[in-house]
Amino acid sequence: EVIKIEPLYGELARTLPLQREGRSGYFVQHNIGKKTMAIDISSKEGQDICHGLIKQADVVVENFAPGVMKHNNLDWETLKAINPDLIMCSISCFGQDGPLANLPGFDWIGQSYAGIIDLLGKKDDTPIFGDFAFGDVATGAHAYGAIVTALMHRMRGGSGQHIDISLIEVLFSFHELSVQLFDSTGGQMLPTRAGPDHYLLAGAGIFKCQDRYLFIVGLNQWLGLTRAMG
């Protein structure tokens, strides 16, 4: 059972287009199967309701800016005193501590700080951002893996724990080539935007054909690729 806590006026996503039969398709897509409760967590009554739910909860997931949960008596120290076996996962842009922790942020902000957007687009043109929230999605997947691991730890006799997941750490891990190339060459090799091509690998890119675009990766199949091309 998953219970989503929303403000009294409802989550903003409920208003997003497109609407069908009075419901947002976006909201339904991301919340299907969840139960919802509208609670004013800034009030004593609302906090008491949340504390009651915590007593029987296995997992709490929150994505407020760091400090908001503590301000509303819903921080880890408070909740683990109520339920020592609780698994709590806090998701934020920059993590729960550090020099950027108090800054708010969302997917595209995280992509910018992590250097993702700087590598998207044509070499001498403006960087671009994709119309996909892959930072949000990937961070959710990382959180899922961490939560399941924490639950397994608890099943084997461990205690509850607080998990800190940040968008910027997840997005930075996307640099499967960039970071190690820069580091191993002493900064001599700088990843660059390359448009439809790859800045390092030959035989990988997007090519315009007669009726559509074709993406080719022929790294270990170069001879086969050239034969297929005639």
Predicted stretch roles:
Residues Y113-G230:
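Acidic, glycine-rich segments within the central catalytic cores of soluble metabolic enzymes
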